[in-house]
């Protein structure tokens, strides 16, 4: 009976929602893409509450700089990761308990994955690539965090998702791609030198310089547009599905577009990052700092 509890609760909520909809107490509102493809409810407010100041603003500014929902979501992801890192590093023991064993398993998996491509160079890039992977993973699935946002417009009280997938914003993916670009160019400078890097652009013959140069510019473009396109496309598709059937049909698809696709795209981004870094390193031996 306990296992049936969540199912019964979900059925009761669905039936109650439809009943309120039929009575005109609440209504469904198709969310704009900038707020995520989730169900939003709107409730008509009494005139006395039309000017009530709701605290949750989707976009504002600080000292002239815009603070959008993407920025807020990115801050949330960074704060969440800092809290997880601090919690996971407390009370470490020689014989690990379940919490410590869980994080050591993740560390071991990433260490083996990086070692296959980077060899001994993984010692230098593990921190960056590991942090990048965890940031991408949480950013891609942040829409699963049940944090509501509230707003009031024209006498209508709206409940919408407070967070948006940061990687569905091109500004985020381009910024991450530029960090990766700096990493593999710095690796090339480290192993081949400044002039060696530019000499490589003329190989195997000088006529290849335009193509090689275009290839270097294509790397950050590739990883940024790939990640942005996949995450934003998922939002568009789910938004269309919510437009057609706002309650039951789109819900299971979040497991694919938000969870499965988010995990896969995180792996794709870091794998391409490691491939680019490995291509810059080549056969050079690991150099200690």
UniProtKB/Swiss-Prot annotation:
Any one cellular-component term (Gene Ontology): proton-transporting ATP synthase complex
Topology term for the membrane: Multi-pass membrane protein
UniProt keyword Transport present: yes
Molecular function terms, GO-annotated: proton-transporting ATP synthase activity, rotational mechanism
GO BP terms, alphabetized: proton motive force-driven plasma membrane ATP synthesis; sodium ion transport
Residues passing through the membrane, by range: 7-27, 65-85, 129-149, 169-189, 231-251, 257-277
Alphabetized Pfam families for the sequence: ATP-synt_A (PF00119)
Location of the protein in the cell: Cell membrane
InterPro entries: ATP_syn_F0_a_bact/chloroplast (IPR045082), ATP_synth_F0_asu (IPR000568), ATP_synth_F0_asu_AS (IPR023011), F0_ATP_A_sf (IPR035908)
Swiss-Prot/TrEMBL keywords: ATP synthesis, Cell membrane, CF(0), Hydrogen ion transport, Ion transport, Membrane, Sodium, Sodium transport, Transmembrane, Transmembrane helix, Transport
SUPFAM superfamilies attached to this UniProt entry: F1F0 ATP synthase subunit A (SSF81336)
NCBIfam families reported for this sequence: ATP_synt_6_or_A
Described purpose of this protein according to its UniProt entry: Key component of the proton channel; it plays a direct role in the translocation of protons across the membrane.
Note: The ATPase of P.modestum is of special interest because it uses sodium ions instead of protons as the physiological coupling ion.
Family statement: Belongs to the ATPase A chain family.
The protein's assembly and partners: F-type ATPases have 2 components, CF(1) - the catalytic core - and CF(0) - the membrane proton channel. CF(1) has five subunits: alpha(3), beta(3), gamma(1), delta(1), epsilon(1). CF(0) has three main subunits: a(1), b(2) and c(9-12). The alpha and beta chains form an alternating ring which encloses part of the gamma chain. CF(1) is attached to CF(0) by a central stalk formed by the gamma and epsilon chains, while a peripheral stalk is formed by the delta and b chains.
Name the record gives this protein: ATP synthase subunit a, sodium ion specific
Organism: Propionigenium modestum
């Amino acid at each position: 009976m306990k296992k049936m509890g969540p199912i019964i609760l979900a059925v009761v909520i669905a039936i109650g929602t439809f009943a309120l909809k039929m009575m005109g107490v609440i209504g469904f509102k198709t969310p704009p893409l900038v707020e995520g493809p989730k169900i939003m409810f709107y409730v008509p407010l009494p005139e006395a509450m039309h000017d009530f100041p709701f605290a949750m603003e989707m976009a504002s500014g600080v000292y002239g700089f815009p603070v959008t929902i993407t920025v807020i979501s990115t801050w949330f992801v960074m704060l969440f990761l800092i809290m997880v890192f601090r919690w996971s590093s407390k009370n470490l023991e020689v014989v690990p308990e379940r919490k410590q064993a869980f994080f050591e398993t993740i560390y071991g998996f990433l260490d083996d994955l990086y070692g296959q491509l980077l060899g001994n160079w993984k010692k230098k890039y593990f921190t960056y690539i590991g942090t990048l992977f965890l940031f991408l993973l949480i950013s891609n699935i942040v829409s699963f965090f049940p944090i509501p946002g509230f707003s009031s417009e024209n006498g209508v009280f709206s409940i919408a998702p407070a967070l948006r997938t940061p990687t569905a914003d091109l500004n985020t993916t381009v910024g991450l791609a530029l960090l990766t670009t700096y990493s593999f160019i710095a690796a090339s400078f480290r192993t081949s030198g400044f002039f060696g890097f530019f000499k490589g652009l003329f190989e195997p013959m000088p006529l290849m310089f335009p193509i090689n140069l275009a290839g270097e510019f294509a790397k950050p473009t590739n990883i940024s547009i790939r990640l942005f396109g996949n995450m934003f496309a998922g939002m568009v598709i789910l938004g269309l599905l919510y437009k057609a059937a706002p309650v039951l049909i789109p819900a299971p698809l979040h497991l694919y577009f938000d969870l499965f696709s988010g995990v896969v795209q995180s792996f794709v981004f870091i794998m391409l990052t490691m491939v680019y870094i490995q291509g810059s390193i080549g056969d050079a031996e690991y150099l200690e700092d």
